[in-house]
């Protein structure tokens, strides 16, 4: 008689639950080890208890290498599919932008007066209305720019006038101050008293002749000597 089907549900008894966890955990780790040895398979087993304790087994030397390989196998196909889908979306977006660029280039040629032969009367009238509207906008913008420039020039003119008035006021103030200083100096010069005549002492000449210490005889009392000491007359008397 075969074994009946066992209903799987949470074990309510805490001790029984811990015992069952230990037995099943050890059995699972043993099966993983046997599978890696018997079948030469790369096996990685990770178990967390209800308390958060970690139990693990890895048939290779590095659990990280096995997990990285698992990540490449599991998510590589998804990334490839997503990349292919993104490429398709990018190509469709490129085609839309390309068509829009061609339309804009053709419209630009029509505005410049090129390739008008393929346009009918209705298209030409529409193009004319577009050009008229563009001209009105251009003229309006040009007028606004001129008004702005005029306003700027008026402001600069007003600023220069203010500077000119300020400089003129300063110049007048400096002139008045200089005039006052010069006037005060002239008044002080006129009010200064003249020098009295007694300041200069006249030189007094002494008319009394100082008598010479040598007694000089008058000229008419001197008798000319016609002979020298030797008694010989000079040559001019001969």
Curated annotation (Swiss-Prot):
Q: Which residues form a coiled coil?
A: none
| All copies of domain MADS-box, residue ranges | 1-61
> Is Membrane set as a keyword in this record?
no
All copies of domain K-box, residue ranges:
87-177
Which UniProt keywords are listed? DNA-binding, Nucleus, Transcription, Transcription regulation
The domain of life for this entry's organism is: Eukaryota
Disulphide bridges, residue numbers: none
Q: Which SUPFAM superfamilies match?
A: SRF-like
Query: Is the keyword Transport assigned to this protein?
Result: no
Task: Specify where it is mainly localized.
Answer: nucleus
Q: Which GO terms describe its biological process?
A: positive regulation of transcription by RNA polymerase II; regulation of transcription by RNA polymerase II
Cellular component (GO) terms are: nucleus
User: Which molecular-function annotation in GO is an example for this chain?
Assistant: DNA-binding transcription factor activity, RNA polymerase II-specific
Pfam families, A to Z: K-box, SRF-TF
The protein's location, in the record's own words, is: Nucleus
Q: What does this protein do?
A: Probable MADS-box transcription factor that functions with J2 and EJ2 in meristem maturation.
Q: PANTHER family of this UniProt entry?
A: SERUM RESPONSE FACTOR HOMOLOG (PTHR48019)
Specify the protein name: MADS-box protein 04g005320
UniProt source species: Solanum lycopersicum
